[in-house]
């Protein structure tokens, strides 16, 4: 049994953003949720998030999670922020885990190691890491496992700044925590109450303070846009490695972007520059071409999305293909063996088995029957300026190039629409519809006009 407190009240001025720092996205998900999910993995008895700057937005992001919220009205430092949780946890005996909302790389295993030290008798345990460049972090003074002190960088003399072992911002405490917090003073350059000052307070009360050396990567926090990009790179590298370990082929993996919510099956091939977002799900043997973008899109086994195609909220069934340079908008459903080619846009439309739309077409609010061919330049004119209307095309029909089908309209099974037609009435099954002016040839006119006759 333990309680976990996540500190998420900081303003994040160096981000230069109106968005609270902990809500900046990492791989499509707010930074804070990484810290929250690591905390939940250890099944805490109580989970408190301390919010402050932009707190209303932060609380909104926490909706649906089993958390309690404490407020820090004034930004007076990390110790002051943690003290705001006392009202919720006053009767909780401990131990307590404390982490930061802007440190998203911490693993449950590392947090468990901190907690274990307190359960084994330490009063306080803090996570440390050795960084090649420790700029911006508090430095650790220690003797063996025992921590002698923790000095904030802004208050550190040069010889202490030279130390590369830093405070990674994660702690475990025994039940003495809130009593100790009330002894923290703000006698420092920033006039703030620092959480690391608890090291000296715990030691003064005869309680052991231990360091747990962690992986340097996990200590990375986010205070600037550059650090945000660095942390996102770490998360991406981990995610790519995980999927390649499960049988996904990535060609030039360092160029591929994907989010944790994406699901991939074995033998999927991702070409350079592929972007996979949201609830995208890709089945076995599928291929995603160079610089294709898929968001909330499903590819059933064997489907292909070719280069530079953008798909949002689409569903491709086995053997279907789209691209290159196709656009599939929400509600686009391509059944088995459908092919949508270059510069074809499909929106809120069902294309039945074997439909071909090779190039330069727009299919919106349409249903196209099995085996039908859509010629180049075909448009379903679905919008009359006020409402959207449906176009229905039957099985094995042929829609000639550069035709416009003005909805609402139906073209029957095995019907033909002549090239260049504007269809405003239903076309019966098996009929030929031609809606254009009859061609006239004026003999000799061109030669006379050009003066060569």
Swiss-Prot record:
Region (N-acetyltransferase): 247-453
Intracellular or extracellular location(s): Cytoplasm
InterPro entries named in the record: Bifunctional_GlmU, GlmU-like, GlmU_C_LbH, Hexapep, Hexapep_transf_CS, MobA-like_NTP_Trfase, Nucleotide-diphossugar_trans, Trimer_LpxA-like_sf
Record-listed Mg(2+) binding positions: 102, 223
GO cellular component, one term: membrane
Function: Catalyzes the last two sequential reactions in the de novo biosynthetic pathway for UDP-N-acetylglucosamine (UDP-GlcNAc). The C-terminal domain catalyzes the transfer of acetyl group from acetyl coenzyme A to glucosamine-1-phosphate (GlcN-1-P) to produce N-acetylglucosamine-1-phosphate (GlcNAc-1-P), which is converted into UDP-GlcNAc by the transfer of uridine 5-monophosphate (from uridine 5-triphosphate), a reaction catalyzed by the N-terminal domain.
Family statement drawn from the similarity comment of this UniProt entry: In the N-terminal section; belongs to the N-acetylglucosamine-1-phosphate uridyltransferase family. In the C-terminal section; belongs to the transferase hexapeptide repeat family.
Catalytic activity: alpha-D-glucosamine 1-phosphate + acetyl-CoA = N-acetyl-alpha-D-glucosamine 1-phosphate + CoA + H(+); N-acetyl-alpha-D-glucosamine 1-phosphate + UTP + H(+) = UDP-N-acetyl-alpha-D-glucosamine + diphosphate
Annotated binding of UDP-N-acetyl-alpha-D-glucosamine, by residue: 7-10, 21, 72, 77-78, 138, 152, 167, 223, 329, 347, 362, 373
Keyword terms: Acyltransferase, Cell shape, Cell wall biogenesis/degradation, Cytoplasm, Magnesium, Metal-binding, Multifunctional enzyme, Nucleotidyltransferase, Peptidoglycan synthesis, Repeat, Transferase
CDD domains to which the protein is assigned, alphabetical: GT2_GlmU_N_bac, LbH_GlmU_C
Cofactor: Mg(2+)
Protein name: Bifunctional protein GlmU
Record-listed acetyl-CoA binding positions: 376, 382-383, 401, 419, 436
EC number: 2.7.7.23, 2.3.1.157
GO terms, molecular function: glucosamine-1-phosphate N-acetyltransferase activity; magnesium ion binding; UDP-N-acetylglucosamine diphosphorylase activity
Pathway membership, UniProt: Nucleotide-sugar biosynthesis; UDP-N-acetyl-alpha-D-glucosamine biosynthesis; N-acetyl-alpha-D-glucosamine 1-phosphate from alpha-D-glucosamine 6-phosphate (route II): step 2/2; Nucleotide-sugar biosynthesis; UDP-N-acetyl-alpha-D-glucosamine biosynthesis; UDP-N-acetyl-alpha-D-glucosamine from N-acetyl-alpha-D-glucosamine 1-phosphate: step 1/1; Bacterial outer membrane biogenesis; LPS lipid A biosynthesis
Note accompanying the cofactor annotation: Binds 1 Mg(2+) ion per subunit.
GO biological process, one term: cell wall organization
Linker: annotated span: 226-246
Matches recorded under PROSITE patterns: HEXAPEP_TRANSFERASES (PS00101)
Subunit structure: Homotrimer.
């Amino acid at each position: 049994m333990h309680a976990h407190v996540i500190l998420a009240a900081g303003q994040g001025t160096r981000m230069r953003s109106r968005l609270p720092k902990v809500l900046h996205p990492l791989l499509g998900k707010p930074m804070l949720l990484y810290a929250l999910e690591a905390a939940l993995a250890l099944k805490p008895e109580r989970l408190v998030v301390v919010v402050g700057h932009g707190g209303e937005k932060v609380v909104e992001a926490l909706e649906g999670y089993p958390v309690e919220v404490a407020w820090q009205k004034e930004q007076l430092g990390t110790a002051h922020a943690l003290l705001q949780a006392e009202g919720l946890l006053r009767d909780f005996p401990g131990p307590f885990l404390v982490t930061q909302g802007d440190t998203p790389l911490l693993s449950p295993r590392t947090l468990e190691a901190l907690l274990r030290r307190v359960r084994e008798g330490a009063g306080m345990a803090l996570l440390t890491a050795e960084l090649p460049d420790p700029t911006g972090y508090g430095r650790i003074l220690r003797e063996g496992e025992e921590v002698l002190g923790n000095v904030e960088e802004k208050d550190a003399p040069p010889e202490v700044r030279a130390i590369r072992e830093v405070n990674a911002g994660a702690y475990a405490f025994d039940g003495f925590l809130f009593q100790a917090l009330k002894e923290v003073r703000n006698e420092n350059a920033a006039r703030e109450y620092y959480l690391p000052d608890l090291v000296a307070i715990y030691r003064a009360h005869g309680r052991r303070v231990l360091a747990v050396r962690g992986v340097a990567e996990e200590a990375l926090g986010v205070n600037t846009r550059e650090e945000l990009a660095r942390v996102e790179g770490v998360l991406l590298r981990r995610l790519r490695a995980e999927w390649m370990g499960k049988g996904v082929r990535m060609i030039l993996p360092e160029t591929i972007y994907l989010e944790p919510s994406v699901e991939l099956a074995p033998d999927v091939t991702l070409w350079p520059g592929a972007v996979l977002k949201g609830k995208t799900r890709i089945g076995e043997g599928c291929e995603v071409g160079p610089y294709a973008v898929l968001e909330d899109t499903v590819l059933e086994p064997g489907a292909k999305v070719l280069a530079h195609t953008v798909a949002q909220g689409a569903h491709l069934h086995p053997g279907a293909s789209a691209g290159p340079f196709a656009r599939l908008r929400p509600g686009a459903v391509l059944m088995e063996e459908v092919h949508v080619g270059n510069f074809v846009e499909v929106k809120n439309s069902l294309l039945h088995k074997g439909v071909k739309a090779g190039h330069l077409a727009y299919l919106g609010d349409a249903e196209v029957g099995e085996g039908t061919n859509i010629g180049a330049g075909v448009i379903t004119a679905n919008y009359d300026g006020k409402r959207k209307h449906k176009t229905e095309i039957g099985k094995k029909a042929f829609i000639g190039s550069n035709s416009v089908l003005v909805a609402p309209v139906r073209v029957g099974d095995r019907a033909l629409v002549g090239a260049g037609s504007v269809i405003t009435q239903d076309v019966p099954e098996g009929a030929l519809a031609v809606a254009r002016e009859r061609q006239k040839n004026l003999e000799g006119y061109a030669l006379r006009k050009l003066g060569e006759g």
